[in-house]
Design a protein with these regions (language model features):
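Conserved acid/base catalytic micro-environments in cytosolic active-site loops
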Residues: 1-277, 484-493
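PAS-family sensory modules
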Residues: 2, 478-523
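Glycine-centered, small-residue-biased loops immediately flanking beta-strands
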Residues: 158, 345, 447
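Class I S-adenosyl-L-methionine
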Residues: 233-241, 248-315, 325-331
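Extended basic-aromatic, gly/pro-enriched interface segments that bind polyanionic ligands
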Residues: 317, 338-417, 423-429
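Conserved SAM-binding loop of SAM-dependent methyltransferases across substrates and taxa
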Residues: 321-339
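A short glycine-rich, Lys/Arg-flanked "PGG" loop and its adjoining helix->strand segment in the class I
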Residues: 432-445
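Conserved beta-strand signature within the Rossmann-like core of class I S-adenosyl-L-methionine
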Residues: 445-453
């Protein structure tokens, strides 16, 4: 008989850093959990946190059932309980679960039953709390819960495992994650533990020994530039190294020199690595307090005194799949309605990832967005469809999406607002400095720069004045001493005779690219 010893906080801390695995399942999940844990060795060095969809009105016996399938202790999670390696923790019924500093946090769900996404909620918190040590697993189940959680884990440098839909009793959740492109591994449940342990070992080796093989890393970066046209040499080496290691682990390669040769021999892997390096993590109204500060402290002054024929111009570089852009568009639309302003707002939303831009242009998002969008906003600005929610035309038509490399392509100009959140944290100081100057160049005098809470303008107090240090809102200052020496390396932009006037709507096509967009709407 297994004694269910729960680790104390001191014991958990003494065990050091270790991977934490979040497993989500719905219908058919019990069978999948059993098969999974029968193949997990007791001394595996990982903690497992289970988030099944449970009946909120009945006590759960899942811990007793799963204890038969593993030698590890299986316990029902308690509030503030620290997780420790070689242990299994199960969410209680009718509770929402997150993790903070390695300890379980429980709360009463705010959403009514049927609208809850407990797997997404936990995996998102796991990504934020554990970063590259987070592992997300989606098993059998209906619906889409877990898809956005896996996206957060991948964006934080973690790894995701999804049950092969052909082996799942219900394939809805696995299929959703795979179709969205958020599955690092797609495997039958029985094969997951071995692959998970191998991946954890490979990533641990690379984490403890950051990329020191400069020649191999340079060969990889040069190959990426030659094949994709994009230079990642000014991205932080730790970030690049982790993402290369994640691709290496999928091919059971532990040596970067070997992986460099593998890339040269397998051109398709170059594209896979390129997609791996594209940081694509976003959500509607991410950091709600920051959006509240923008709405209360910045936008009213920005709107004040604008005539009806004014065109307020917003650029969202690194827009990913468009949630941030549409959040800003909704926020501005609401405030304009409340204050009686009737000028036009035009968004230029750009990203390097062609697939992400395709999702943004379609403006259709999964049902999971109910976690991030208030019910009144869902009803006002979205149309419910079979696959999720579509952004309404009145918001969608404000935005032009285009493919752009913000690092090498010239910036837009004469902008009122630049919103670039969670991109510069991945850049080396020199490139970060160039980008801050580029944003200053792009903004009108008094224009606003909106960054994420983890970013800053660095040592550029001569270019920007803080509006909110907490929520990283800055006003561009264009004094005589302010430097505006931005030298873009891409093609120069000039006015074309057939350019549309600023207030005229831009026709959006599937093929809209930055160069074409520039000719039509920039000047």
């Amino acid at each position: 008989m297994v004694t269910r010893k729960v680790a104390t906080k001191r014991e958990a801390e003494a065990s050091g850093a270790f991977p934490i695995v979040g497993l989500g399942a719905s219908a058919g999940g019990l069978e999948a959990f059993e098969h999974f844990f029968r193949n997990v060795p007791r001394d595996n060095g990982m903690a497992f946190v289970l988030v099944p969809h449970l009946d909120p009105g009945h006590a759960s016996i899942l811990t007793e059932i799963l204890q038969r399938s593993t030698a590890m202790p299986v316990v029902e999670a308690q509030h503030s309980m620290p997780v420790a390696p070689n242990g299994v923790y199960v969410i209680p019924p009718n509770r929402e679960m997150t993790i903070f500093h390695g300890a379980i946090q429980l709360s009463v769900p705010e959403q009514p039953r049927g609208h809850r996404m407990p797997i997404d909620a936990f995996l998102r918190s796991l990504a934020e709390d554990q970063g590259e040590r987070a592992i997300g697993v989606i098993l059998s189940g209906t619906g889409t819960d877990g898809t956005l959680g896996l996206r957060a884990i991948l964006g934080a440098g973690g790894v995701s495992f999804v049950q092969d839909p052909a082996t799942a009793k219900y394939d809805g959740m696995p299929a959703s994650a795979i179709q969205a492109g958020y599955a690092t591994y797609v495997l039958p449940v029985e094969r997951m533990p071995e692959a998970m342990l191998t991946s954890a070992r490979t990533l641990a080796v690379n984490r403890e020994s950051p990329p020191t093989d400069g020649s191999s890393l340079n060969r990889i970066l040069m190959l990426l530039r030659a094949v994709t046209g994009n230079d990642f040499s000014q991205y932080k080496k730790t970030t690049i190294g982790r993402r290369i290691a994640r691709r290496m682990s999928q091919h059971d390669i532990e040596n970067m020199e070997v992986y460099a040769r593998y890339l040269k021999e397998h051109p398709s892997e170059v594209q896979s690595l390129f997609k791996e390096l594209l940081i694509n993590v976003t959500s509607f109204f991410r950091d709600p307090e920051a959006f509240a500060a923008l709405r209360t402290d910045v936008l009213p002054q920005m709107f004040a005194g604008k005539p009806e024929d004014y065109v307020l111009r917003v650029w969202v570089p690194g827009c990913a799949t468009g949630e941030e852009t549409f959040s800003l568009a909704i926020l501005m639309h609401e405030l304009m309605g409340e204050t009686g302003h009737d000028f036009k707002v035009q968004f230029y939303s750009t990203d390097l990832d062609e697939d992400a831009i395709g999702v943004a242009r379609a403006a259709i998002y999964p049902p999971n967005i109910v976690q991030d969008v208030l019910p009144q906003r869902l009803q006002r600005f979205f149309v419910k469809e079979e696959v999720g929610y579509r952004v309404k035309k009145e918001i969608r038509e404000k935005v032009v999406f285009a493919i752009q490399n913000v690092i090498k392509d010239p910036p837009f100009t004469r902008l009122d607002l630049v919103s670039c959140r969670n991109l510069m944290i991945y850049l080396e100081p020199e490139l970060h400095d160039r980008l801050v100057r580029a944003f200053h160049y792009a903004l009108k005098p008094g224009g606003v720069l909106f960054l994420s809470p983890s970013e800053s303008i660095g040592d550029h107090d001569d270019l920007f004045a803080p509006l909110s240090r907490e929520w990283k809102l800055y006003r561009a200052t264009h004094s005589v001493g302010a430097t505006r020496d931005v030298t873009p390396v891409g093609p120069s932009w000039s006015s074309e005779s057939d350019s549309k006037p600023p207030g005229e709507p831009v026709k959006i096509t599937k093929e809209t690219h930055l160069a074409e967009l520039t000719k039509r709407v920039l000047l």
